UniProtKB/Swiss-Prot annotation:
Residue span of region G1 motif: 38-45
Substitution effect: residue 488 to W: Significantly decreases receptor-mediated endocytosis
Effect of residue 774 to A: Increases clathrin-mediated endocytosis (CME). Increases interaction with SNX9
UniProt modified residues of type 3'-nitrotyrosine: 125
Record has Repeat as a keyword: no
PANTHER family listed in its UniProt record: DYNAMIN, DYNAMIN-1
Catalytic activity: GTP + H2O = GDP + phosphate + H(+)
Protein name: Dynamin-1
Region (G4 motif): 205-208
EC number: 3.6.5.5
Stretches the record annotates as G3 motif: 136-139
Function per UniProt: Catalyzes the hydrolysis of GTP and utilizes this energy to mediate vesicle scission and participates in many forms of endocytosis, such as clathrin-mediated endocytosis or synaptic vesicle endocytosis as well as rapid endocytosis (RE). Associates to the membrane, through lipid binding, and self-assembles into rings and stacks of interconnected rings through oligomerization to form a helical polymer around the vesicle membrane leading to constriction of invaginated coated pits around their necks.
Length: 864
């Protein structure tokens, strides 16, 4: 080729393949190579063995090649083989190479007939090979055998497509000559991925096994079934030759003799056979690499830029340098502190758009989950009134009280305040859980130092647990402070006079039925989940919740109201999701066992996320719709047992007024307590836990890490990180070397140009049989035409027969003769004759011969 740099291209690509295969990125970079495709038992592996000159590939019946074999042939003075997975081991016995291929295949695919797309990289050094890189792929098959899955045909096809769809991959389409070439699996795949034929090279095997009297001359001359890069014929060893231990050197000599002695192929002998195929593939692969150099250079440069920043940290890396470890430790601690603060306080960078995280989840706990838990702890209305009535009667004792006792108010309030402890402690637990989760998220960046990550998580988590006790003590102190003194002079407390006035107003409202303007608590979309399919199925509506009722509309314009439901006597319960449902569901039901909506005992409402469900539940709590409790039925039965007392209560108007007054006072004071607790709980947790943890990370974490032991052990890298660093450095140097070699290559080197396009429509129609089975190209002398005058020099095919009588006088056109064998066996093959236009014969004269004076005018010809 006149340029030493061009000869180095194939070894360069081999080095790139090894470097990229080692780091698992071979599929990302489209390296120039040759993929060998063909049907099962088409002779692909035999062609590769002929290249090497050794028996080294597994043989047998059915599918033998079950993993892609990347075969890198390197011209060298000594002969040996190396596997990428057996680094440093040289195989001089090629029988061991065969056994290693079988063993490596079984390690991944199993001992039966399974397949895998993971390639085996084999490099063969030999003085008998040219620099070449080929990929031997599993043969295409139709029927699964052994433990192969039923879709083995599609699995193999998908594996082939991973290689042949790449623009830089040449396709070596191997087809046997003794089968219909127009139905060749290899050519079908090649046509599908390379419709222009720019990457496809045809190989015809088993030429010696064709039926007697047939040959593939027209195919090999690229006339019958043309490909842009043409065909090359080879003759492999038969099974008898293999069983007889016929070596490949003798097989190549027999192949050469076959082409020289065969009458149909002797004129093509210098362009047939395995040595010529190897030479052509070497030349075409080298030219293909040269043609793809600009694109390959761009991909290499982009790959280099993508890893350059990371490799920059590794260039001067010294594992035992104490200064490096100290610097890395300081950087890791500082990065962890910054990440933790950003996750808690919020930041514009690295925003999670899929779910809430860090501070956003804690905010949701403070302002949605905690208020919800507070409201859940309130008494049921009937139970609360019953307890107030018992308290009033027990305070009066044997006497009949004339005034409402304030001791009843204090007793009920203290009982209510004590119940706040549970949701407050639960709030602390939820915040702790989120903090620990945030710590683990922030330490993910420390994966390269597993000991440091483990120790850092342990120290910070231990500190959070220590602050947990202090925070819970302070929360309990807040509740005890509320229990210590009932401040009935609070500016927001209604007092006895206002409570009695409100009680009277409520009675008037019940009798008059007048309604003031109602405040809207929440609006939003919900899906009614339990409507039957016959009635339209689940539908989404626009819901409006107020303190008095729940309404839903067709859309958010609120023009077409579908239904309005009173919230009196309603409660909430959770509903399990259906098997195929992705929505989260809760239900409304009537405590008096009445239908809630039409014929339904409960109204099932669905949301997309659990957060929406929790938010709607909190809104329903504000409207007085509480969750169902486990003890509701027991309390209901107790109420029935004490039905006489309830009846007596309802019969005593004075007691009923006193109960209503205390109820209003309790509501007013508990609203003050809840407001205070909802305000102080986030502040307490922020001060004692979250802010304290941030300060600990910034000021004391590093000191704790230094005091925990040996820093060298703490900063030990993980094995995965060390391996990744070595692989990244190896790939970086391989990329730099590749770009350096490519830069030295003269890309203007003259090479064999791409052949011109050919008519390959036969691949689409696929109706032409393989081989020269028609008499149009029979090489044998069995069907010779009668002796005819010699043809003009340079003419193709036999001369036409003598003209029929009357043809010189303008009669019917001559009937074409059936072509026979070419008189010159080394001359060009005969052309395939076209169908002549049929013309009617001339009308003969009475004498049986046309008169010279009255020539017979021919009738105009017509086409059938």
């Amino acid at each position: 080729m006149g340029n030493r740099g061009m000869e180095d291209l194939i070894p360069l690509v081999n080095r790139l393949q090894d470097a990229f295969s080692a780091i698992g990125q071979n599929a990302d970079l489209d390296l120039p190579q040759i993929a060998v495709v063909g049907g099962q038992s088409a002779g692909k592996s035999s062609v590769l063995e002929n290249f090497v000159g050794r028996d080294f590939l597994p043989r047998g019946s059915g599918i033998v090649t079950r993993r892609p074999l990347v075969l890198q042939l390197v011209n060298a003075t000594t002969e040996y083989a190396e596997f990428l997975h057996c680094k440093g081991k040289k195989f001089t016995d090629f029988e061991e190479v065969r056994l290693e291929i079988e063993a490596e295949t079984d390690r991944v695919t199993g001992t039966n007939k399974g397949i895998s797309p993971v390639p085996i990289n084999l490099r063969v050094y030999s003085p008998h090979v040219l620099n070449l890189t080929l990929v031997d792929l599993p043969g295409m098959t139709k029927v699964p055998v052994g433990d192969q899955p039923p879709d083995i045909e599609f699995q193999i096809r998908d594996m082939l497509m991973q290689f042949v769809t790449k623009e830089n991959c040449l396709i070596l389409a191997v087809s046997p000559a003794n089968s219909d070439l127009a139905n060749s699996d290899a050519l079908k795949v090649a046509k599908e991925v390379d419709p222009q034929g720019q990457r496809t090279i045809g190989v015809i095997t088993k030429l010696d096994l064709m039926d007697e009297g047939t040959d593939a001359r027209d195919v090999l001359e690229n006339k019958l079934l043309p490909l842009r890069r043409g065909y090359i014929g080879v003759v492999n060893r038969s099974q008898k030759d293999i069983d007889g231990k016929k070596d490949i050197t003798a097989a190549l000599a027999a192949e050469r003799k076959f082409f020289l002695s065969h009458p149909s192929y002797r004129h093509l002998a210098d362009r047939m056979g395995t040595p010529y195929l190897q030479k052509v593939l070497n030349q075409q692969l080298t030219n293909h690499i040269r043609d793809t150099l600009p694109g390959l250079r761009n991909k290499l440069q982009s790959q280099l830029l993508s890893i350059e920043k990371e490799v920059e940290e590794y260039k001067n890396f010294r594992p035992d340098d104490p200064a490096r470890k100290t610097k890395a430790l300081l950087q890791m601690v500082q990065q962890f502190a910054v990440d933790f603060e950003k996750r808690i306080e919020g930041s514009g960078d690295q925003i999670d758009t899929y779910e809430l995280s860090g501070g956003a989840r804690i905010n949701r706990i403070f302002h949605e989950r905690f208020p919800f838990e507070l409201v859940k702890m309130e008494f049921d209305e009937k139970e609360l009134r019953r307890e107030i009535s018992y308290a009033i009667k027990n305070i009066h004792g044997i006497r009949t009280g004339l005034f409402t006792p304030d001791m009843a108010f204090e007793t009920i309030v203290k009982k209510q305040v004590k119940k706040i402890r549970e949701p407050c402690l639960k709030c602390v637990d939820m915040v702790i859980s989120e903090l620990i989760s945030t710590v683990r998220q922030c330490t993910k960046k420390l994966q390269q130092y597993p000991r440091l990550r483990e120790e850092m998580e342990r120290i910070v988590t231990t500190h959070i647990r220590e602050r947990e006790g202090r925070t819970k003590e302070q929360v309990m102190l807040l509740i005890d402070i509320e229990l210590a003194y009932m401040n009935t002079n609070h500016e927001d407390f209604i007092g006895f006079a206002n409570a009695q006035q409100r009680s009277n107003q409520m009675n008037k409202k019940k009798t008059s039925g007048n309604q003031d303007e109602i405040l809207v608590i929440r609006k939003g979309w919900l899906t009614i989940n339990n409507i039957g399919i016959m009635k339209g199925g689940s539908k989404e509506y626009w819901f409006v919740l107020t303190a008095e009722n729940l309404s839903w509309y067709k859309d958010d314009e609120e023009k077409e109201k579908k239904y309005m439901l009173s919230v009196d006597n309603l409660k909430l319960r959770d509903v399990e999701k259906g098997f195929m449902s992705s929505k989260h569901i809760f239900a409304l039901f009537n405590t008096e066992q009445r239908n809630v909506y039409k014929d339904y005992r409960q109204l099932e409402l669905a949301c997309e996320t659990q957060e929406e469900v929790d938010s709607w539940k909190a809104s329903f709590l504000r409207a007085g719709v509480y969750p169902e409790r486990v003890g509701d039925k027991e309390k209901a039965s107790e109420t029935e047992e004490n039905g006489s007392d309830s009846f007596m209560h309802s019969m005593d108007p004075q007691l009923e007024r006193q109960v209503e007054t205390i109820r209003n006072l309790v509501d007013s004071y508990m609203a003050i307590v809840n407001k205070t607790v909802r305000d102080l709980m986030p502040k307490t947790i922020m001060h004692l836990m979250i802010n304290n943890t941030k300060e600990f990370i910034f000021s004391e974490l590093l000191a704790n890490l230094y005091s925990c032991g040996d820093q060298n052990t703490l900063m030990e890298e993980s094995a995965e990180q060390a391996q990744r660093r070595d692989e990244m450095l190896r790939m970086y140097h391989a990329l730099k070397e590749a770009l350096s070699i490519i830069g030295d290559i003269n890309t203007t080197t003259v090479s064999t140009p791409m052949p011109p396009p050919v008519d390959d429509s036969w691949l689409q129609v696929q109706s032409v049989p393989a081989g020269r089975r028609s008499p149009t190209s029979s090489p044998t002398p069995q069907r010779r035409a009668p002796a005819v005058p010699p043809a003009r020099p340079g003419s193709r095919g036999p001369a036409p027969g003598p003209p029929p009588a009357g043809s010189a006088l303008g009669g019917a056109p001559p009937v074409p003769s059936r072509p026979g064998a070419s008189p010159d066996p080394f001359g060009p093959p005969p052309q395939v004759p076209s169908r002549p236009n049929r013309a009617p014969p001339g009308v003969p004269s009475r004498s049986g011969q046309a008169s010279p004076s009255r020539p017979e005018s021919p009738r105009p010809p017509f086409d059938l």
